[in-house]
């Protein structure tokens, strides 16, 4: 399971011109589910995302996690993160989880984040979405379990 996380000052996701999820200060989490993923991996990745210390403390050092920084999460499914890109000029997606499995694990990941006590907004699984964000820093990390 893969999370591309971006520290943001604002982020929103629109579907057909309608905003379905939005946050101010926090993390935009683009989530990719692979065929070998399971609930245990989803829970571990959630703990890593929620605990990752990439917000500045009073000494301007990356030392606070999203909750300590008073932030929120915007979680958006993105199957393209599971693409194979090593060969050729076209991505392959055989490492991606089947749609039903991916959707179940996506929702499980979101629920785990909510159980961490974080305000968690979402996009819509498998929808054509437009994501708008202001990356703070920019600070972006690729997390994989």
From Swiss-Prot:
SUPFAM superfamilies for the chain: DTD-like
Motif (Gly-cisPro motif, important for rejection of L-amino acids): 137-138
Record's keyword annotation contains Nucleus: no
Predominant subcellular localization, coarse grouping: cytoplasm
Reactions catalysed according to its record: glycyl-tRNA(Ala) + H2O = tRNA(Ala) + glycine + H(+); a D-aminoacyl-tRNA + H2O = a tRNA + a D-alpha-amino acid + H(+)
Compartmental location: Cytoplasm
GO biological process: D-amino acid catabolic process
One GO molecular-function entry: Ser(Gly)-tRNA(Ala) hydrolase activity
Keywords for the protein's UniProt record, in alphabetical order: Cytoplasm, Hydrolase, RNA-binding, tRNA-binding
GO cellular component terms, semicolon-separated: cytoplasm
Family matches, as InterPro entries: Daa-tRNA_deacyls_DTD (IPR003732), DTD-like_sf (IPR023509)
Enzyme class: hydrolase
Enzyme Commission number: 3.1.1.96
Domain characteristics, as noted in the entry: A Gly-cisPro motif from one monomer fits into the active site of the other monomer to allow specific chiral rejection of L-amino acids.
Functional note: An aminoacyl-tRNA editing enzyme that deacylates mischarged D-aminoacyl-tRNAs. Also deacylates mischarged glycyl-tRNA(Ala), protecting cells against glycine mischarging by AlaRS. Acts via tRNA-based rather than protein-based catalysis; rejects L-amino acids rather than detecting D-amino acids in the active site. By recycling D-aminoacyl-tRNA to D-amino acids and free tRNA molecules, this enzyme counteracts the toxicity associated with the formation of D-aminoacyl-tRNA entities in vivo and helps enforce protein L-homochirality.
Family stated for the protein in its record: Belongs to the DTD family.
Quaternary state and interactors: Homodimer.
Protein name, as recorded: D-aminoacyl-tRNA deacylase
Gene transcribed to yield this protein: dtd
């Amino acid at each position: 399971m893969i999370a591309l996380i971006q520290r943001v000052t604002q982020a929103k996701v629109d579907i057909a011109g309608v905003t379905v999820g939005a946050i101010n200060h926090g993390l935009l989490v683009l989530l990719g589910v692979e065929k070998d993923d399971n609930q245990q991996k989803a829970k571990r990745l959630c703990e890593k995302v929620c605990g990752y210390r990439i917000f500045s403390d009073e000494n301007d050092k990356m030392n606070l996690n999203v909750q300590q920084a008073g932030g929120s999460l915007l979680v958006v499914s993105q199957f393209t993160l599971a693409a194979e890109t090593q060969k050729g000029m076209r991505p392959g997606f055989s490492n991606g989880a089947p749609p039903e499995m991916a959707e179940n694990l996506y929702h499980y990941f979101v629920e785990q984040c909510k159980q961490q006590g974080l305000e968690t907004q979402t996009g819509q699984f498998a929808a054509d979405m437009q994501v708008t964000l202001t990356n703070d820093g920019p600070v972006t990390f690729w997390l994989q379990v």
